[in-house]
Structure formats: structure tokens, C-alpha cells
Amino acid sequence: MVSVSLSHHNLWPPESGSTAFRGFATAASVHACHHVSRHLRLDFHLRSSLKKLQHFSDDARMKFARYQRVFVFNGANFLKSRVDIRLSQSSPFVCFFNGGESRLNPRGGEEGSSNPETSKRNTVNGRRWTNVLLAINVIMYIAQIASDGKVLTWGAKINSLIERGQLWRLATASVLHANPMHLMINCYSLNSIGPTAESLGGPKRFLAVYLTSAVAKPILRVLGSAMSYWFNKAPSVGASGAIFGLVGSVAVFVIRHKQMVRGGNEDLMQIAQIIALNMAMGLMSRRIDNWGHIGGLLGGTAMTWLLGPQWKYEYTTRDGRRVFMDSAPIPLLLRWRNEQRRL
């Protein structure tokens, strides 16, 4: 995950003198992202392009049983499942989980046949917007190539121009990249963490976190303290701020559901190591925009804390279904508003 600061006089690849460091940064970033994809494993039967993600424990003593893999928010299935689920008629933020129709064998699998087409479709749906964002990054880079790499024209982050009213640069900078290696690192990182974040929060919350993090990245520099101007006056491009926001989003989810997740502390340690590694690389080179990384991380963390999900067990119905409530601040506020309307 690298966000590159560009010289005003050199808006294409960095000078050759930094080749050795760029090689180290590339290897370190790829290694860090590989650790993310290995350690953030979800038991939602969703796959990234690297491997099947399995994170939730198969331990029957967990508050979530093995078959409870679907979360519903306002009528939308955020995580796919093969079991029965019903949305509460009294509140759009209540989930009913029922595993009675899907028996589990001792090895952790389900008895009976499964539909390969359904499994494939669920896997694709679980990363649909990740694929869209990857395609946008590649298409925008092709457009840059066609225009001789003029990233300023396409919307690179330039503090002075943003302050003059070109606010669109807050968003467009996150889909631009300085060179092919920059694009490859960020696409690899997005492909590693994106499906996990999209599966945990669903497409709407995933996009909200990604876009907020992308915008929060330059805002921290433009509206922040004088130190941000001092350390990063140059234009910058890159999707790493938004990707850092997704990392923060996954961290918030793990923290909120630590009692339901086996190995949550280890996952948080891995996330902390990845963040620290990228921060260290930023300190070693002025061409890596640490302020963008910090801004994206804070933006994604804050948005996930507000939007959720934060699933809280409420009770078990007479027919054995467990009811979970999304108790994140905004879902709570919306539920309260809906209740007030019914009064």
C-alpha cells in the first residue's frame, strides 16, 4: 500500500536514485498484504483471489453457531449463507438466524449436496465492488498513459488547487498512480483486503468506508495542522489511503466481535504490524505519503465505528432462532427514528 508524492517538475516515475528503496518498499508491501490475506480468514465461504477466507471459529461454543453467517441490514443480505434467515418485521436492523434446516456433520461441513453455481455466484457477489474498484484503477491508469502521464490534468492532489475550489481532486487522486509498480502494489493490496471488508460490512458500507477514506486522506493534509503542509507539500496520487481505510474497517470489526472470533488478538497484531511497516517505509522516503495513509486509516476507522456492523446477541426465539441486533451508532439512531415514527 503506497501513496506516492510527486515532484512538481517530475510527475511520472521517481528518479532512478531511489530504485533500491522502491524495490524494498514493493517487497515489503506485497509481503504485508500477503499476511493480511492469510490471517484475516472468515468462515463465510467467500474467497479472495488468493485463497478461501476463513476467520470465524467452527467452535460450537461460540455465540455464533457455525451456520450463522448472514447479517441483514435494512433488507439487504450483506453476507451470504446457505441457511434460513428472516428479517424482523418490527425493525430492519434485527436478524433472525435459523440453522435447523441445514444439519452439520462432525467434520464441519453440511450434510447433503451443495450447488456449485450458487457457491460461485456468492463468491463473486462477495467481491463485486472490489472488482469494480480494481477495474477503475486500471482504466484510469490507461487513460493516464494515453495522455502522456499528465496526472495533474486527471486530478492529482494539489493543496493549492484544492484550496481554490477544485474539491474534486480530493476523490480523483485516489484512482491515479505514478507508475506501473505503484499501480500493481495498490491493486494487490486492494485485492487482498477488499473482499474481506466487503464481506464483513456489505457493499453499501464497503463503498462508504472506501470513499470516505479516499477523501479523508487529502483532507488530513489540506485542512490539518501546519505540520502536514511542512512534510508533504508536493502533489500526490494513489489508492493507498482508501486501502488503509479498509484495513481500519476490518480492525474495528474484529475489535467489536473479539468474543465471537477465535484468534482476534493475533489478527489485530498482524494489522498493527502492517500499519507500522508502512509507516516506517514512509519515514524512510519522502516520496511515500504517510499523511495520506494516516488520513485514510482514521477515515475508515471512524466510518466503520459509526456505520457498523456491531452485532449484539439479543435473545433466542422459541423455535431456536437467535436474534442479533446491529448496535452501531447510526443503525441505532435509524432504528430509534423508525420507532418514533410508529408511535
Swiss-Prot record:
The keyword Kinase does not apply. It is a multi-pass membrane protein. It is found in: Plastid, Chloroplast membrane. Expressed in roots, cotyledons, leaves, seedlings, stems, flowers and immatures siliques. The chain crosses the membrane at residues 132-152, 167-185, 206-226, 235-255, 267-285, 291-311. Disulfide bonds: none annotated. GO terms for cellular component: chloroplast inner membrane; chloroplast membrane. It is an enzyme of class 3 (hydrolase). Disruption phenotype: Longer roots and increased number of lateral roots. No effect on the appearance of plants or time of flowering. Reduced fertility. Rbl10 and rbl11 double mutants have no visible phenotype. Residues 1-26 form a transit peptide. It comes from the Eukaryota. Rhomboid-type serine protease that catalyzes intramembrane proteolysis. Required for correct root growth, floral development, fertility and photoprotection. May be involved in TIC22 processing during its import and in AOS accumulation in the chloroplast membrane. Belongs to the peptidase S54 family. This is RHOMBOID-like protein 10, chloroplastic. The lineage of its organism: Eukaryota, Viridiplantae, Streptophyta, Embryophyta, Tracheophyta. The gene is RBL10.
